[in-house]
Amino acid sequence: MSPTPPLFSLPEARTRFTKSTREALNNKNIKPLLSTFSQVPGSENEKKCTLDQAFRGILEEEIINHSSCENVLAIISLAIGGVTEGICTASTPFVLLGDVLDCLPLDQCDTIFTFVEKNVATWKSNTFYSAGKNYLLRMCNDLLRRLSKSQNTVFCGRIQLFLARLFPLSEKSGLNLQSQFNLENVTVFNTNEQESTLGQKHTEDREEGMDVEEGEMGDEEAPTTCSIPIDYNLYRKFWSLQDYFRNPVQCYEKISWKTFLKYSEEVLAVFKSYKLDDTQASRKKMEELKTGGEHVYFAKFLTSEKLMDLQLSDSNFRRHILLQYLILFQYLKGQVKFKSSNYVLTDEQSLWIEDTTKSVYQLLSENPPDGERFSKMVEHILNTEENWNSWKNEGCPSFVKERTSDTKPTRIIRKRTAPEDFLGKGPTKKILMGNEELTRLWNLCPDNMEACKSETREHMPTLEEFFEEAIEQADPENMVENEYKAVNNSNYGWRALRLLARRSPHFFQPTNQQFKSLPEYLENMVIKLAKELPPPSEEIKTGEDEDEEDNDALLKENESPDVRRDKPVTGEQIEVFANKLGEQWKILAPYLEMKDSEIRQIECDSEDMKMRAKQLLVAWQDQEGVHATPENLINALNKSGLSDLAESLTNDNETNS
């Protein structure tokens, strides 16, 4: 008897994996871990789970001992190598990262996240992406909750950029499909007029609010005092607009819209009446370049009353406010899929938004520095944003187009048709004119002279039809004046003479009679014809009988099997007949005008006889087009000696009809 294999022991395996993991960390080599993994008895899943626990145990000890970030990152790097070698589960590195970021303070989390950013290519690989994308998203969201939006602005931005690099553009978790707003972004300002300091003189405001040291700002560099006095009402209305920018849905309410309209007109009037000088902005820009060009960005507006004068004198601040207007107007005018049906602008609101948009662009172009260029750039970006809105309204379809599966049989690529194939020498003996209707008309009668003599080409009217109107006018009871009679029309008289010469024996006048004028002659002929022609009732009855005969003939013609056979074969008929044809396809091929090269191509494409037969019929259908009818196929079968198949196809065709 062969010895039984040793059983898997979790404590023993975990001890061995822990020891080999520490050895691999010390040697900075994964070989000891691979060797232990191959020596430990048990299934692969059991060993992977045990090694995952060993990694988490070692990481826990390092965190408790307050080890450096380098030691922690070494463990995670070793786990990544283990996943690549197939000895760890794919989620192990992400679980370790989550444990580390949950336990370390924010300053050390910055170092750990730098490691995460550098390995974004690893996380996007096929081995890690599907297993770790949810871990990374949850880890980043937990980290964002711990960070302060005002104090850790840069760190928050790095996390958002990392997520943008990690996930594809069509990832649903980052698209805000329902167009929700960040209602938590509340702008706090002084709402108590009693506590306002704007009523004091400008000098007192400057002394209490800002102590300017000597040499900090000269008299020439100081902003000029606003020509429109800034009071508490302007301050309150200005900062109240931020609530509409935060939640644009308020603009669809009647009362809120009136408030927004009133506040906006006053604020924009201030911007129009107090325009900035380009020299001050240029001087400020030059000073920034001399000092290194460092630009400090604040995520929130400073709403102190003492800064109102300086803010209105700042070109960047004005650009922020005007840009908020343009973004708000674009949302109000745009088509948003999840916008309520009640959120519709009136014609008056739409007109005001259109006029105000032009005013805002004008203010942007007048705002230094490079106002004209900045205005055009903003307009271009907002126009491009319309494409993004349309894409979201369509449900964010993927930009990667998948190749459609082709289930149809491969069609044989044929060379250009030889002249004899369309000059009446094919199996159908038809001359192809290059157009379906022209081909049908040309082949109705092969002999052109016989076609010209056909009774169907007789377009000359009968005497009854042509002279019917003249006979009615000649009747005295109708009391038609001579000048209105048709016989007095020269054109009518010319055609009447030609018809009488062909159809009537009274055309030739006896030589002993005096020649009359054309109207008198026609009047005399009309009287003679009226006596010879049958009464109208008999004529109508005869016409009805002829119509009935024509209808019966038409019905019989429609019921003719020849007409039904003129229809081209369908794909279903080809599929059924190919199964019956089978191995005899090669006998039929020459009679379908197939060349030897095409027959060899069919033999090379498939080993299955039924598939070869199907390819033969498909190639014949492509070659003949609308002339690939069951009747032509039956003729080819009879010529090739396959009478049984021809009879079977005839019966199937009659049954389907």
Swiss-Prot record:
Modified residues (Phosphoserine): S2, S537, S560
UniProt biased composition (Acidic residues): 206-222
Positions of crosslink type Glycyl lysine isopeptide (Lys-Gly) (interchain with G-Cter in SUMO1): K595
Basic and acidic residues bias: start-end ranges: 553-569
Induction section of the entry: Up-regulated during cell proliferation.
Short motif Nuclear localization signal, span: 414-430
Keywords linked to the UniProt accession: Acetylation, Apoptosis, Cytoplasm, Deafness, Disease variant, DNA-binding, Isopeptide bond, mRNA processing, mRNA splicing, mRNA transport, Non-syndromic deafness, Nucleus, Phosphoprotein, RNA-binding, Transcription, Transcription regulation, Transport, Ubl conjugation
Protein origin, superkingdom: Eukaryota
Disorder noted: Deafness, autosomal dominant, 86: A form of non-syndromic, sensorineural hearing loss. Sensorineural hearing loss results from damage to the neural receptors of the inner ear, the nerve pathways to the brain, or the area of the brain that receives sound information. DFNA86 is characterized by progressive, bilateral hearing loss that is most predominant in the high frequencies, begins mildly during the fourth decade and gradually progresses to severe-to-profound deafness in the seventh and eighth decades.
Protein name: THO complex subunit 1
Organism: Homo sapiens (Human)
Gene name of the record: THOC1
